[in-house]
Swiss-Prot record:
<feature type="binding site">
    <location>
        <begin position="71"/>
        <end position="76"/>
    </location>
    <ligand>
        <name>NAD(+)</name>
    </ligand>
</feature>
<dbReference type="InterPro" id="IPR030960">
    <property type="entry name" value="DHQS/DOIS_N"/>
</dbReference>
<feature type="binding site">
    <location>
        <position position="246"/>
    </location>
    <ligand>
        <name>Zn(2+)</name>
    </ligand>
</feature>
<feature type="binding site">
    <location>
        <begin position="129"/>
        <end position="130"/>
    </location>
    <ligand>
        <name>NAD(+)</name>
    </ligand>
</feature>
<keyword id="KW-0479">Metal-binding</keyword>
<dbReference type="GO" id="GO:0000166">
    <property type="term" value="F:nucleotide binding"/>
</dbReference>
<feature type="binding site">
    <location>
        <begin position="105"/>
        <end position="109"/>
    </location>
    <ligand>
        <name>NAD(+)</name>
    </ligand>
</feature>
<dbReference type="Pfam" id="PF24621">
    <property type="entry name" value="DHQS_C"/>
</dbReference>
<keyword id="KW-0520">NAD</keyword>
<keyword id="KW-0963">Cytoplasm</keyword>
<comment type="pathway">
    <text>Metabolic intermediate biosynthesis; chorismate biosynthesis; chorismate from D-erythrose 4-phosphate and phosphoenolpyruvate: step 2/7.</text>
</comment>
<feature type="binding site">
    <location>
        <position position="142"/>
    </location>
    <ligand>
        <name>NAD(+)</name>
    </ligand>
</feature>
<keyword id="KW-0862">Zinc</keyword>
<dbReference type="Pfam" id="PF01761">
    <property type="entry name" value="DHQ_synthase"/>
</dbReference>
<keyword id="KW-0170">Cobalt</keyword>
<dbReference type="GO" id="GO:0046872">
    <property type="term" value="F:metal ion binding"/>
</dbReference>
<feature type="binding site">
    <location>
        <position position="151"/>
    </location>
    <ligand>
        <name>NAD(+)</name>
    </ligand>
</feature>
Amino acid sequence: MKIRIDIPHHPYDIQIEKGCLAQAGQWLRELWQPQKVVIVTDNHVASLYAEKVKLSLEDAGFQVAVFDFLEGEERKNLTTVQKVYEFLVKQGLTRSDGIVALGGGVVGDLAGFVASTYMRGIHFVQIPTSLTAQVDSSIGGKTGVNTPFAKNMVGTFAQPDGVLIDPLVLETLGKRELIEGMGEVIKYGLIEDPELWALLTELDGSVESILEHAETLIEHSCQVKRKMVVEDELDNGVRLYLNFGHTIGHAIEATAGYGKVMHGEAVAMGMVQISKVAEKKGLMPAGITQSITDMCQKFGLPVDYENWDVDKLYQALTHDKKARGNTLKLVLVPELGSATIHPVSLEEMKDYLVK
């Protein structure tokens, strides 16, 4: 299946197909002329797929080198970026060459940031290998790295030339790594797609059910992301809906120490906490918090953060990228399948951190 991201200045396709990783070279040959390519990946994904993708690209006429770094959110920083820059220089990459981001969200965010800043921007594509990356982070052109202050605090908007999604690679994910991706999938059902929510309701929450329906879950999620990115590429309007659960979620990730709490886990806890307070304030319908909690728990996602520290979380929130002056744009769900922006002051945001 192809999904067109029809952005006027940089349209591209998301290709979703079981087994398509083996045809990565042919796919890239349709996008780029043969040239130098660097595959950026982490050491875990490299051990599984780097050689397979490298050979496919070489068979298509590309000159290929591989850069891998230690896996983990804690490696998504400017230190790693500098190492990639140095590798690109040693490989002699020019502005006519490109980067292939092969991995999960950490790899995609970092590789995209490198591509958008090296020589003021070179071409790149995304080949996401985690569920979170396949349904969310590989699409839409947000790149970035973390700082000690906040998640993704340094970044750019830079669209890839294409996204290649092979649902079969999810079979090599660990259980926790697969399940955390469901945090984003559940979010899509809540903010935009009642049909997706209905499907999630039917599934039994097992790993087997996720893998069996992975292609459908990915397609639904990508369609929601496509709609919002095309309408609001630079994150000033409806694209903000995609941040449901992320305001508190990112704060949890930052205060826990990057890598301790996975992104989808933090999003799940963020959605539950925001909904609980918003429901009490009459801003979300009665019972929705329980529905979200039940759905997250069915798939094995955490709904409560054991190291909850209001002061530390609030400090992290002050660095949120959605902040404008002293106001945060909080995303709420007034009814299933619909989202809205609710501006709150940073001071009022403290209410949403109270258990």
